[in-house]
Amino acid sequence: QLLTRKNNYSGTTYAAEKHIALWELINEPEAFSYTDIQSNPAAYADFQSWAAGNGQQDNDASYALFRQELIRDYIDGMYDVIREAGAQQPVVWSHNWHRYRNGNPDIFKGALASKAEAVACCNYPGQDLVPQNYWSNPKDLTSQDYSGWFNQYFDDVNGYGWMTLPEYAGKAKTVYEFETFFNQSAYLYPIQAQYFRALGVQCASMWTYTMQEYAPYHCGSHFLSLTCTPKKAASFIVAGGK
């Protein structure tokens, strides 16, 4: 229904809308762990049925195989729905935050084997330095040196290094989403742009530009405004040319 709905401004269906570049199926998806699924009777029954039908044991290793197939089949099913609706934009599967591969390699294998043309990740240097809930615990990280952070996760396959593995040569890479996270400096956007290019990223989207009307009342993270953060805005323009 979303794909066949008409854009009120252009009169074009979203499936045919030329200003939509990609379809990301789920933003920051998560999946049950083997421990989690045992507390969900319906989902656990599905796994047990799969295990019995495939000669597998009821254990963590077998569940990883089940989850790998589940992720692949879900992506492929959604991919087919999108194509049947007439949309031709690349389909993207999000691999969430850095370190998400740690403990979840089966999810990555499932997406890799799927029909999705692209995979995505998030990039928020400094997020680990602020307690959750982030909005209730703001912290000025402008003077923070992130060089070690970027270097640490570039080659780490459980960080961002998985994006440069040979098996991902057939997948486009994108970033959704990124921000400088409580950092109002002018240097981070250009560094992020160079970092993404080094990882083979072809498209990156920030979350989110702050609208003019409420920008004077907003601050901290997810904050970019030409009038209220001119230094960041200038660096964003520079990053666009990197």
Task: Label each residue range with its predicted role.
Residues 65, 69-72, 76, 80, ...:
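Glycoside hydrolase catalytic-domain groove-lining segments
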Residues 41-55, 137-153, 242:
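Charged, glycine/proline-rich intrinsically disordered loops and linkers
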Residues 182-242:
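Substrate-binding cleft of secreted/luminal carbohydrate-active enzymes
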Residues 25-28, 96-98, 124-126, 178, ...:
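Active-site beta-loop-alpha junctions enriched in small/polar residues
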Residues 30-34, 100-102, 127-130, 182-184, ...:
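Short catalytic/ligand-binding loop motif for oxyanion handling, primarily in non-cytosolic enzymes
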Residues 21, 117, 202:
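Conserved acidic residues
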Residues 1-113:
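Active-site mouth of glycoside hydrolases
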